[in-house]
Amino acid sequence: MMSLKPDWVEYSNEEIEDLIVKLYREGNSTSKIGIILRDQHGIPSVKAVTGLKITQILEKHEMKPEYPEDLMNLIRKAVNIRDHLKEHPKDLHTRRGLQIVESKIRRLVRYYVREGVLPEGWRYDPQKAALLVK
């Protein structure tokens, strides 16, 4: 794939990959890595410069996260809402919010199973999700 590297980007593809691996080892998420590269290193888009997405670069270096970041964020949010509902069982607005978040999780899981990111038959279970997040 041809990459349209801006003239003012001073990093080579190998240097960008090394930066991504270093930032991931420091505990940064893929989205945070993109923000750091944009704001501190002047790399507007990793895909535009290298031709690969951040997750593809991590996969190439065998550092791919077990679950996609967006799914983990939604699961974390659902676990926090469940904890809130244990203390405030009559909070109906939050209960509705939990239904919406869990619906998003199920739709995203369906997509990731279809795309082969998650194994066939992977299901969202709130009890297992709490263990997964912690």
Swiss-Prot record:
GO cellular component: cytosolic small ribosomal subunit
Listed InterPro entries: Ribosomal_uS15, Ribosomal_uS15_arc_euk, Ribosomal_uS15_N, uS15_NS1_RNA-bd_sf
Pfam family, one: Ribosomal_S15
A biological process term (GO) from this entry: translation
Protease found in the keyword field: no
Domain of life: Archaea
One annotated GO molecular function: structural constituent of ribosome
SUPFAM superfamilies reported for this sequence: S15/NS1 RNA-binding domain (SSF47060)
Keywords of the record: Ribonucleoprotein, Ribosomal protein
Record has Chaperone as a keyword: no
Subunit structure: Part of the 30S ribosomal subunit.
Similarity remark: Belongs to the universal ribosomal protein uS15 family.
PANTHER family according to UniProt: RIBOSOMAL PROTEIN S15P/S13E, SMALL RIBOSOMAL SUBUNIT PROTEIN US15
The protein, known as: Small ribosomal subunit protein uS15
Organism this protein belongs to: Methanothermobacter thermautotrophicus (strain ATCC 29096 / DSM 1053 / JCM 10044 / NBRC 100330 / Delta H)
